[in-house]
Amino acid sequence: MAKRVRRVDRKAAGKEAEQKKPSKVTLFCRSLQRLKHLYCNINIQMPSITKKGILVLILPFLLLPFFRADAASDIYGSFEELKLNEDPSDFSISTREHDPSVLILAIHGGGIEPGTSELAREIAENRSLYLFEGLKSAGNAALHLTSSHFDEPKAVQMVKEHSHVISLHGYGSDDKKIKIGGTDRERAELLTDVLKRHGYPAVLLGINDKYAGVSPNNLANQSSSGLSIQIEMSTGFRKSLFDTFTLKSRASTQNGTFYQFTKTISDFITENYQ
């Protein structure tokens, strides 16, 4: 029997929708234009000032947008911008289409949010999967696009073609914690209870939490039903699933905790989705 699900009020969730900020690439271009404009004006009005003097005067104003920007903000504002500025060998996209009821989504895989790739592949063994991975030897954070800005065409298509999405993420903390959010509040609560019963440090987030993932702009919430579960795992917890937590070694050093955890998630999906 299909279970009754409780939706989040999407209008209320929209209040916390992330305002799209200019990317750092865009800010840099604007700064160059501002530099040219200021240089010409100063040079005309005060021709006796040297070029070095002009640069000293205007440099603080050019750097101001970068100091004001959130340190964790994306470098790029869209996938198209990322693709135009990054080497194609530095990222990969993997997809598999199966039952349209559930899509396993991991848009920060590889070295971006380490461990989410391996978890997504295992959980989606017999399910639909979308996976974006950063493959740089270092600096994969440059490939991070927030869920509200991730607009890679295949990802958007697959999300819309599935009725529910389970989105895997990682956040930086040495503590071992799992934060459960998403718009599918009933199933999110059920999953939290299941994880707790199996001994995992899970907590259900309120819709106002920054990791709740309930914004209508969030890619995971653009499925045919608008229902999602977002699983945010701390660095400490993700590290506990592998014997060696490096990009090249994670796939071959998944430990018993990894397989117990992914089986718990997989069994939950089988029992609660049709």
What are these regions (language model features)?
Residues 69-274:
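N-terminal catalytic or cofactor-binding beta/alpha core of small enzyme domains
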Residues 1-7:
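N-terminal targeting leaders characterized by basic, low-complexity, disordered sequences
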Residues 56-65:
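Bacterial N-terminal signal peptides
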Residues 46-54:
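Bacterial N-terminal signal peptides that target proteins for export
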Residues 21-26, 53:
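Positively charged N-terminal leader segments that act as targeting/secretion signals
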Residues 11, 20-21:
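Polybasic, lysine-rich low-complexity intrinsically disordered segments
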